A protein has these predicted regions:
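Condensing-enzyme catalytic core mediating Claisen C-C bond formation in acyl metabolism
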Residues: 1-25, 37
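Generic secondary-structure signature for well-ordered alpha-helical cores
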Residues: 13-16, 39-44, 73-77
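Short, conserved micro-motifs enriched in small and acidic residues
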Residues: 21, 25, 29, 90-94
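Short, well-ordered amphipathic alpha-helical segments that serve as non-catalytic structural scaffolds
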Residues: 28-43, 67-71, 96
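N-terminal structural subdomain of ketosynthase/condensing enzymes
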Residues: 42, 50-57
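Short acidic capping loops at alpha-helix termini that bridge into adjacent secondary structure
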Residues: 45-51, 80-82
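Conserved catalytic cysteine-centered active-site region
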Residues: 56-99
Length: 99
């Protein structure tokens, strides 16, 4: 069976400095905002998402190690939606799109 892969939306977090204005906002919260915005821009529901891929480099807490999964669920995707992180340092975002 042939399946078509479609990228319906891409969103990123703000770029800040280490210890700057976003220091008190957990990465998983920022990522969940990104998921919600991507769903809104694509005019789709979380239950319709097949996979979630996040480019993510620095883990600040143990729960950040699976940031993509936490973000997917907290952002509105179904608990059955698979997710994975990509760590390619500066190229993480681009690798997430390619993956």
């Amino acid at each position: 069976m042939s399946r078509e892969v479609v990228v319906v939306s891409g969103v990123r977090t703000a770029i800040g400095t280490y210890g700057g204005s976003l220091k008190d906002t957990p990465p998983t919260e920022l990522a969940a905002l990104v998921v919600r915005e991507a769903l809104a821009r694509a005019h789709t529901e979380g239950k319709d998402v097949g996979h979630v891929v996040f480019g993510h480099v620095v883990n600040t807490e143990p729960k950040d190690m699976y940031l993509s999964r936490v973000a997917a669920i907290n952002g509105g995707c179904a608990e059955t939606t698979p997710a994975f992180n990509v760590n390619r340092l500066c190229g993480s975002g681009l690798q997430a799109i390619v993956s």
